[in-house]
Structure formats: C-alpha cells, structure tokens
Amino acid sequence: MSQSQRNSDGWTPRTRLGRMVQDGDVTSMEQALNSGLPLKEPELVDQLLPGLDDEVLDINMVQRMTDSGRRVKFRCVVAIGNRNGFLGYAEGRDDQVGSAIQKAIDVAKLNLISVDRGSGSWEDSAGGVNSLTRNAEGKAGSVTVEVMPAPQGLGLAAAETVSNILELAGVEDAWTRSNGNTRTTVNLAKATYNALRNASQSRTPRRAAAKQREQEVSE
C-alpha cells in the first residue's frame, strides 16, 4: 500500500466509513454518525474528534474459576466526551488495569453518540445548548435514569456518576431522577448513557432504525 494511502499516524482504514474519512468525503463526527455506516475503527474517531476527555467511573475485580484455577481480571467502566455534544461509554476487561481502561476507551469511541442538547427552558435564549431538548430515559439492569431539561444556571442536580457523564456530554443544566439499585456504578452509568442515546435516536430516525442502536448498550 502506498504512503499516500496512510495518514500521518500510520492508520490504514479497514472500513468504507474509514476510507471516506481519509479521502475527505466525511469531515465531521456528525456526518459520520449520520452516514448510516457503523463505527468500527477508533482511529476514525481520533481523526474527526481529537482530544476527547475520558473518565474512569469504576474499577472492579472480576474472578472466574477455570480448569487451571481462579482467574482474576479487572473490569473498568469508562465514559468519554468532548464536553460539547459528543459522548461515548464502554466497559473493558483485562488482567491489567491500564489495559482494561484502554480497551474501554477504544470501545467507547465506537459507541459515540451526538447528544440532543438544547436551551432547556423557554425562558432561556433560543439556540442554547446548556441542557437537553426533552426528557430522556434509559435503563440498565434494575436501574432507571431520567434526565430532564433545566434552565440555565441551575447546574446538574444529579449523583456524581451521572453528573460526570453529563459534563462529558456538554450538558451543564439538568434535573435527574433515578430508581433501582443505584449503588451499582456500572448500571447507573450505563442507564445514563442509554438515556442520552435514546434521546439522540428520537431525533435521528435513520440511525434509530439500525439494529445496533435499537438495543441498550451491552458489555
């Protein structure tokens, strides 16, 4: 393969969407998400949305019995975002904490969504993006999280895990409500992500029609 087919980081696209990004046919993350093509390459996200922030929400040891004895792995829950409308979430497992975190970050890039932000109140100036445009609800396990629009200046009325995710998404003002075993960080985080993704899908029927985006995020 010629050098011109590689970018400066040595990335060789393996998918149609990746090639479209490299050729300049897709130049923004919004275009990529609305293309109807699946995100399968973390490097694609690095090209279109560099400098994403990440937050490790939970680290847990997971033990499993095998023929060779007890095996221990680390499960890391990670959320990523640009704090301006894009958010991703995933879990990663590995024998080493650092590797588990990196795996989660890479998968979170493939789960990236465009958050449906808005002014949050009719009293706020038109065109604001400090909150959500509508109520958003998501579920994971026994946990249900509802995120509701709020006027500018309220801040985030939310638990720490929920607040961290909303901040990564660029949501500055919101009321939230949660039910179920909210002490389980992984389900609380997943339900929050699912709430924002469900709201995003409701304004993009084409993407919502895709089977992958109809289901709640899974491990």
UniProtKB/Swiss-Prot annotation:
One of its GO terms (cellular component) is cytosolic small ribosomal subunit. Pfam families: Ribosomal_S5 (PF00333), Ribosomal_S5_C (PF03719). One of its GO terms (biological process) is translation. Residues 196-219 are annotated as: Disordered. InterPro entries: Ribosomal_Su5_D2-typ_SF, Ribosomal_uS5, Ribosomal_uS5_arc, Ribosomal_uS5_C, Ribosomal_uS5_euk/arc, Ribosomal_uS5_N, Ribosomal_uS5_N_CS, Ribsml_uS5_D2-typ_fold_subgr. With S4 and S12 plays an important role in translational accuracy. It comes from the Archaea. The keyword Flavoprotein does not apply. The gene is rps5. PANTHER family: 40S RIBOSOMAL PROTEIN S2 (PTHR13718:SF4), RIBOSOMAL S SUBUNIT (PTHR13718). The N-terminal domain interacts with the head of the 30S subunit; the C-terminal domain interacts with the body and contacts protein S4. The interaction surface between S4 and S5 is involved in control of translational fidelity. This is Small ribosomal subunit protein uS5. Part of the 30S ribosomal subunit. Contacts protein S4. Belongs to the universal ribosomal protein uS5 family. The keyword rRNA-binding applies. GO terms for molecular function: rRNA binding; structural constituent of ribosome. It comes from Haloquadratum walsbyi (strain DSM 16790 / HBSQ001). Keywords: Ribonucleoprotein, Ribosomal protein, RNA-binding, rRNA-binding. Residues 52-115 form the S5 DRBM domain.
